[in-house]
Amino acid sequence: MSLALTLGDPAGIGPEILLKALAHLPSELLGQFFIAGTGQVLEETYARLCQQGQVAIDPAQLQLWEHPLDEVIVPGRPSVASGTASFAYLKTAIQRAIAGEVAGIVTAPISKACWQAAGYSFPGQTEVLAHLTGTAHVGMLFLGRSPVTHWVLTTLLATTHIPLQAVPRALTPEGLNEKLALLIQFLRERRHLERPRIAIAGLNPHSGEQGHLGQEEVTWLIPWLAAAQQQYPEVELIGPVPPDTLWIGAADAWWGRPAPATAYDAYLALYHDQGLIPVKMLAFREAVNTTIGLPFIRTSPDHGTAFDIAGTGVADPQSFLAAIAWAQTLSKGSVFPLTLA
């Protein structure tokens, strides 16, 4: 199964983590990867990493979909040019995936601010993927495999890149139905779980405390959950669970502790930070962002551009390598180890 890998913002750590990650894979597998990027950026990154004594793959060994730059990109200095380039890399990879040239895409981090400065109004890569593929409903799902127990943390966000004050208005039974359907389909088709157990977080502290700390649970979330359970009798839906205790069982399963709390096959978080705080606390190096609902696989490391360390040689490629491994696994290709050799 071939994959497209993007450089992300070339002023960030994307070029570095890509070259480091591919250096840890068997050379006979390199023919499966196509890089959407700029050769000059890769060559300069490789030369710098060699001077810094870092292990990286020579870009000459890679298959490149070249996008030339009009301006010089300096590591750690985000610009309109770097935003324009990162959007072009992503667009190329999407077009190639739509054409069936690759089974999936692994995207390095981009800067939303640079996209805005370059004239692109999309809030993130997920939204671009949905737009260019004509996909009405997609989900932002995070996967992390424990290096201790191999248990997989699976968390779907009901809402994504919106202000916290907009979350209650954005949450609707119809929207949750769409996300739940995507999650169940993913668990069955990609994780082979026919009767999954899915926990749904509450919105308010203590899930509203019977309406004393917020009305959303009482007025529509609990009724929606009851209706969803009737619609999916073969799936166990648990909730709304108070958010401050929901992921305790996940932590026990992650670290292999005796588990008085329950770990679930998947978690549905109602807003961005509610889901990503536990994900990043447990699985910052292992977590992968997966877009579900697309006609092809898309994964991404669960971190940003890290402009502050770009060019220093200290960026950790583990999450990018995990994103490659998950993309291969989910596209039913070869399974790579999820930890660096």
From Swiss-Prot:
GO molecular function annotation: 4-hydroxythreonine-4-phosphate dehydrogenase activity; metal ion binding; NAD binding
Protein name: 4-hydroxythreonine-4-phosphate dehydrogenase
Annotated EC: 1.1.1.262
Binding site for a divalent metal cation: H161, H206, H272
UniProt gene name: pdxA
Keyword Oxidoreductase: yes
Main location: cytoplasm
Phylogenetic placement of the source organism: Bacteria, Bacillati, Cyanobacteriota, Cyanophyceae, Acaryochloridales
Family (UniProt): Belongs to the PdxA family.
Catalysed reaction equations from the record: 4-(phosphooxy)-L-threonine + NAD(+) = 3-amino-2-oxopropyl phosphate + CO2 + NADH
Annotated NCBIfam families: pdxA, PRK02746.1
Keyword Oxidoreductase: yes
Residues involved in substrate binding: T126, K280, N289, R298
Keyword annotations from UniProtKB, A to Z: Cytoplasm, Metal-binding, NAD, NADP, Oxidoreductase, Pyridoxine biosynthesis
EC main group: oxidoreductase
Pfam family, one: PdxA
Gene Ontology cellular component list: cytoplasm
InterPro entries: PdxA, PdxA_fam
Record function comment: Catalyzes the NAD(P)-dependent oxidation of 4-(phosphooxy)-L-threonine (HTP) into 2-amino-3-oxo-4-(phosphooxy)butyric acid which spontaneously decarboxylates to form 3-amino-2-oxopropyl phosphate (AHAP).
Pathway: Cofactor biosynthesis; pyridoxine 5'-phosphate biosynthesis; pyridoxine 5'-phosphate from D-erythrose 4-phosphate: step 4/5
Any GO BP annotation: pyridoxal phosphate biosynthetic process
Other remarks in the entry: The active site is located at the dimer interface.
Cofactors required: a divalent metal cation
Cofactor binding, per record: Binds 1 divalent metal cation per subunit.
Subunit structure: Homodimer.
Entry superkingdom: Bacteria
PANTHER family registered for this protein in UniProt: 4-HYDROXYTHREONINE-4-PHOSPHATE DEHYDROGENASE (PTHR30004), D-THREONATE 4-PHOSPHATE DEHYDROGENASE (PTHR30004:SF6)
